[in-house]
Amino acid sequence: MGGNNDGVSGAACLKPLNGVSPTYVPSAGAGALYFLIGSGLGVVAVLHASGLAEVSGEWASAARWTEVSREWPSAARWAAQLAGSVGAQRLLLATSLLFLAVSVWRLARRCAAVEGRVGSTDSAVRALHVGGVVCAVCGSKIRALKRGCRGVERTRSVDSSKPVSRSLAAEFDQEADGEEEDNAGETSDPDDGSVQYLRRRLKEEMLLKEVALEELEKERHAAASAADEAMSKIACLRSEKALVEREARQFQEMMQQKQMYDRQVIESLQWVIMKSGMQGWEPEAITDRALSETSEDDRDKK
């Protein structure tokens, strides 16, 4: 992977695409050799033109020249010939231009090979996935961005609880898991495979945790709504109870008032009856007394 290769050379970070020959990629040894040759030629040319006797004597000594000729015999001879025939500035400029031309030529071949393999924008996007990334550092950045996007999608899905965002996040996770499985299958290091396995397990556990949190949130909302409904029903029952109690008190007061009124009416009727009875008894006694007197008079006359 790109994130695990810290401390390697710049050429080792470049990964060939599928189908691209590794010969198109300049190796680290070739680049170092070109750089050393160019540096040596430049130093020799500067020493030859400056006329410094001591330094040129040291570089021209037999022992030093023998050591250099053991490493690069052809390069040393070629540098000596060029130093004798061409000026110092021209030699340095020509060496730099030659090295730059070789680098540009190799880079052009590399770009042409990549363009031939990629072809279109969609294929370029597919080529920049983790399995076929050109640069390991770029691949690590792309994976970090994808993980950040997945984290944002997960937070949005938890906050909004929308099925569309959850499905998109699940598709991202499935795609990333498939790519990491392919990369784990291609690698030969068992430690990388165990790391990838642990990462997959961690992602699965995180997804299960998110699902459990969503279910718990739903249950909490349902319990809160049920509690609110129960409290509203209790409040309604309390208000109805208070209304019934108030009506009962009103009816009780009305019954007491009616009972008192009926008692007064009964007492008044009893008084009227008693008064009317006394007045009716006195005329009857007078008539009886008159009849008895008339009957006695009639008897005396006879």
UniProtKB/Swiss-Prot annotation:
Residue stretches spanning the membrane: 27-47, 82-102
One Pfam family hit: Zein-binding
Domain (GTD-binding): residue spans on this chain: 193-299
Membrane topology, record value: Multi-pass membrane protein
Chain intervals for the UniProt region annotation (Disordered): 160-195, 283-302
Tissue: Expressed in endosperm. Not detected in embryo, leaves and roots.
Biased composition regions of type Acidic residues, renumbered to the chain: 172-192
Domain of life: Eukaryota
Localisation per UniProt entry: Endoplasmic reticulum membrane
Annotated Gene Ontology cellular component terms: endoplasmic reticulum membrane
The entry's keywords: Coiled coil, Endoplasmic reticulum, Membrane, Transmembrane, Transmembrane helix
InterPro entries: GTD-bd
GO molecular function: myosin XI tail binding
Coiled-coil stretches noted in the UniProt entry, renumbered to this chain: 199-254
Database matches in PROSITE patterns: GTD_BINDING
Function: Involved in protein body development and 22 kDa alpha-zein localization.
Subunit structure: Interacts (via C-terminus) with both 22 kDa and 19 kDa alpha-zeins. Interacts (via C-terminus) with OP10 (via N-terminus).
Protein name: Protein FLOURY 1
Species annotation: Zea mays (Maize)
